[in-house]
Amino acid sequence: MTKDLLLELGLEELPAYVVTPSEKQLGQKMVKFLEDHRLSFETVQIFSTPRRLAVRVKGLADQQTDLTEDFKGPSKKIALDAEGNFSKAAQGFVRGKGLSVDDIEFREVKGEEYVYVTKHETGKSAIDVLASVTEVLTELTFPVNMHWANNSFEYIRPVHTLVVLLDDQALELDFLDIHSGRISRGHRFLGSDTEISSASSYEDDLRQQFVIADAKERQQMIVNQIHAIEEKKNISVEIDEDLLNEVLNLVEYPTAFLGSFDEKYLDVPEEVLVTSMKNHQRYFVVRDRDGKLLPNFISVRNGNAEHIENVIKGNEKVLVARLEDGEFFWQEDQKLNIADLVEKLKQVTFHEKIGSLYEHMDRVKVISQYLAEKADLSDEEKLAVLRAASIYKFDLLTGMVDEFDELQGIMGEKYALLAGEQPAVAAAIREHYMPTSADGELPETRVGAILALADKFDTLLSFFSVGLIPSGSNDPYALRRATQGIVRILEAFGWDIPLDELVTNLYGLSFASLDYANQKEVMAFISARIEKMIGSKVPKDIREAVLESDTYIVSLILEASQALVQKSKDAQYKVSVESLSRAFNLAEKVTHSVLVDSSLFENNQEKALYQAILSLELTEDMHDNLDKLFALSPIINDFFDNTMVMTDDEKMKQNRLAILNSLVAKARTVAAFNLLNTK
């Protein structure tokens, strides 16, 4: 016989960004609890609103499954003393399992007998097991926690109710300072406290109190309501997924509505209006069927349609205040002078240990010129890079960016164009922030890409130079994101500039006092970002092998990983990798540089391998390079079969190691083959 279990935790309003991850966590913790306690079930369903997290288990067994376990103990010769009695070791072993020596039997394992005991455990009733089910709540983790009242414990928000039902039976449990029951809270304004009659009636009981407990149902309600308004008003609404998920977790009973604002605000840049609506007010942006921005918005009320006209007016009033600010800053900022703003950046701190934003820009100017040369930009592009690098942070001192910091770079482009700057310069000011996330948009122009690289390189090197290096998940200056941007831009634009050369030369340009160890740390940090870019679907040994190669060009490292993944499916992969790996391992024994002396060759295999190495021409085509290296496998194996590398003759040994070292030097441009797993 099976039953349904309901567990609901009622809290004060959760931050929207916490709700969905916490809901998923709760479901996962419940599944683990049931599996660990041998309680079978059919399905687990999760629920969440801003004021509750809940999980329902359907088809829960009324009793644990019985458990039978075999335990292996000491060998028979240790378990029995000279008189054939059980030793203290045997007695201690069975005592630890809650059994006696009468339960011992001997079983043969690989020719020797060992003590074995079999323990049978009868399953407990589900109710007995569920006495500890609040463990799943204790084990939830949150980004931040808080104290409340005089309690010593911490949790994401104060807890008010706990409902635990097995079918219609309320289980009496405690969590923190809350005793469980069947009372849940309805909508803060439209509902009231209500009894949940049974686990199966959970959604219906709450629906009567204006709470839609199922997040997916709530989301679909919002989408359907928006589509209905679209159809009725012949408009088009941008349903941004991130915004939808946020709004979803701000309401328990959603009602979407259409609001409006004065058309005069459409003269303000669209980005300002969209940011005001979307980022600040959590409104959905409205356009006509051709994509033109309209003086309207859609918002979602946490409640029903009663007195909705008052809600609309209130939302319109709040938005207009934002738009008034935007309009004011748009007009006032145009009176400012770019040169004056750049000069004022001398007084703005980039970081107290690093200097001002002006100094940061000065370094970026030098770095960007170097990068523009390496990337073979045209003279016109180089001039644009130089100009952009000289002014690109000026918009940080405008009123608009001070109020709407999401618009940095975007407003810089607009103000630069109004001031008569070249379009390439203006675009670079916007693009230098790209990408803003791990998979965000990249710069479209070469000028913008160079400025973005220079800015990110200086940021990375500056913070490393003063010891502000990310550790664990802590990365307050977003250096991982900046570095991810560096490798993505280099790869996307096909700029095959070796990273080790870049780091060394950029340190020389702007950070001459920094030592080699510091540069090694930077390279390791960049390698970690490249590994992330390669992706976890590529086996770990292949990722490590290409990152330990002597190639520091992003595109070639990525190509090498793909080539190895492809080759790993071939029948010859194991043999080829093992022959190269053997060469790598022996080459590590080279203690000093020795040139190959062909007069010391004793057999044809030495000569054949050395000639093959001399003839080996590797290119930037990693697939072709692997083909060429793997083709050497028979020659390498023939060499090893007929040649004693580590001979007692020191000259001969060093000469043979030199042959292998010359092979490894070429092969390492693809990968460190000795790190590849062929098991």
UniProtKB/Swiss-Prot annotation:
GO molecular function, one term: ATP binding
Localization of this protein: Cytoplasm
Domain of life: Bacteria
SUPFAM superfamilies referenced in this protein's UniProt entry, alphabetically: HD-domain/PDEase-like (SSF109604)
GO biological process: arginyl-tRNA aminoacylation; glycyl-tRNA aminoacylation
Quaternary structure and interacting proteins, as annotated: Tetramer of two alpha and two beta subunits.
Protein name per Swiss-Prot or TrEMBL: Glycine--tRNA ligase beta subunit
